[in-house]
């Protein structure tokens, strides 16, 4: 009996893996042992919750329902939560097949969809991260994950062995407290994952994530020494899993799948929505702007107004069918992000510098949004694949678990 460990490294791009191999020795070694997708297509938009959800479901946001970190629920834009996922997930399918499933810190999974579960360390205030200017309070879907107490006994046993019993409250102090809680939270989830994978009777599927690279890049910027450290930190956590499996004699019998939710790249400018569209209800989804509209006529009027500023309307086929008359999606070309308002010193401006020097979720086909996929383990071919679709991640993991087809993708291994 051996585990499949699925790790998501937030914000680690295809370009990072190609350009910084010396800083990413564990990912590089894994890529040489198995299958490596050099450029995995991002989702639309290439933001955190759509990316996490597509990894689990293998379908696009029109089907799984999570079309942004913020989604329109018919009355307001709010943060998406695990209860918003409409499509079957890897964890649900694995449970239904009688497999043991451990979800440790991976967002967008419900507690009931795992046999061993711990919420994401950031779940208590649902993405109330350092970069959120006006956080939306956590809703019940996220609070339910943070209230969950694992009943499997696995995490309690890990604590008895000397590993951390829980994670710090990231929101109990200043920004330094937040950063250290993030680094600690990521490490704890991976330490638990590594220990479970190396245990005598491991879960069949272990799903975890590392958030640090995304947060640090947003604040420090592309290729900043701090950002490069964050990439190396994520790589070192992958190495913890590899070493634990090696020490236990399970490395050759276990499967590791590592991917990311989106890439990262320089933000050249920001467009300020309160000046572009005063009085509208909108949500800034990185380089995509969602505007609540009352039907196609209002959407056309908004599109005409934004076109004056070089902003084009997206077709909207990535939106769930019932939202296409209620939400219009727009994008600006280049490395442009939308922000609710200008900083105080630029009050009233239409555009200016971004608050965050590095970002993601830009116009479709922006190379910096591309990500990667690495799979290594029994039966996984040693090969490199230039390009693959987002849906191929779930299809590949499902096949490796013997679950049959899942989603709209193809098996890559």
Predicted features and spans:
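A structural signal for well-ordered alpha-helical segments within the folded catalytic domains
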Residues: 2, 24-25, 50, 85-92, ...
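Beta-strand elements within well-structured catalytic alpha/beta cores of enzymes
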Residues: 2-17, 29-30, 55, 94, ...
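Short, structured active-site-proximal loop/turn typified by the sulfatase FGly-forming signature C/S-X-P-X-R
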Residues: 17-54, 58-59, 63, 102
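His/Asp/Glu-rich, glycine-adjacent segments
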Residues: 60-221
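Substrate-binding rim/cap in mid-to-C-terminal beta-strand-loop elements of soluble/periplasmic
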Residues: 277-303, 356-400
């Amino acid at each position: 009996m051996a585990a499949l460990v699925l790790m998501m490294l937030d914000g680690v791009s295809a370009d990072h893996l190609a350009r910084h191999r010396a800083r990413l020795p564990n990912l590089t070694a894994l890529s040489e042992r198995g299958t490596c997708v050099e450029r995995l297509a991002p989702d639309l938009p290439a933001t955190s919750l759509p990316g996490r959800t597509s990894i689990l479901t293998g379908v696009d946001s029109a089907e799984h329902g999570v079309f942004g970190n913020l989604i329109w629920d018919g009355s307001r834009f709010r943060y998406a939560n695990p209860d918003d996922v409409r499509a079957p997930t890897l964890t649900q399918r694995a449970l239904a097949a009688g497999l043991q499933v451990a979800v440790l810190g991976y967002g967008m999974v419900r507690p009931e969809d795992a046999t061993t579960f711990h919420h994401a360390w950031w779940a208590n205030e649902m993405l109330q991260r350092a970069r959120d200017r006006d956080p939306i309070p956590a809703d019940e879907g996220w609070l339910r994950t943070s209230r969950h107490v694992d009943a499997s006994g696995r995490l309690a046993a890990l604590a008895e062995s000397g590993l951390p019993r829980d994670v710090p409250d990231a929101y109990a102090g200043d920004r330094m407290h937040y950063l250290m809680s993030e680094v600690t939270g990521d490490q704890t989830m991976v330490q638990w994952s590594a220990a479970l994978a190396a245990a005598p009777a491991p879960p069949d599927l272990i799903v975890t994530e590392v958030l640090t690279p995304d947060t640090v890049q947003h604040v420090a910027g592309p290729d900043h020494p701090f950002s490069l450290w964050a990439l190396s930190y994520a790589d070192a956590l992958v190495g913890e899993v590899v070493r634990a499996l090696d020490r236990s004699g399970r490395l050759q019998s276990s499967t590791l799948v590592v991917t990311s939710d989106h890439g990262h790249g320089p933000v050249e400018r920001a467009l300020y929505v309160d000046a572009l569209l005063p009085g509208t209800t909108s949500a800034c989804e990185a380089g995509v702007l969602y505007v609540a509209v009352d039907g196609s006529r209002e959407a056309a009027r908004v599109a005409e107004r934004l076109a004056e500023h070089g902003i084009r309307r997206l077709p909207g086929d990535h939106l769930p069918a019932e939202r296409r008359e209620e939400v219009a999606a727009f994008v600006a070309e280049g490395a442009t992000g939308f922000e609710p308002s200008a900083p105080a010193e630029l009050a009233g401006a239409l555009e200016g510098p971004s608050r965050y020097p590095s970002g993601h979720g830009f116009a479709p086909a922006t190379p910096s949004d591309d990500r990667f996929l690495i799979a290594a383990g029994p039966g996984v071919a040693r090969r490199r694949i230039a390009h693959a679709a987002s849906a191929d991640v779930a299809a590949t993991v499902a096949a490796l678990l013997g679950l049959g087809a899942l989603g709209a993708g193809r098996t890559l291994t």
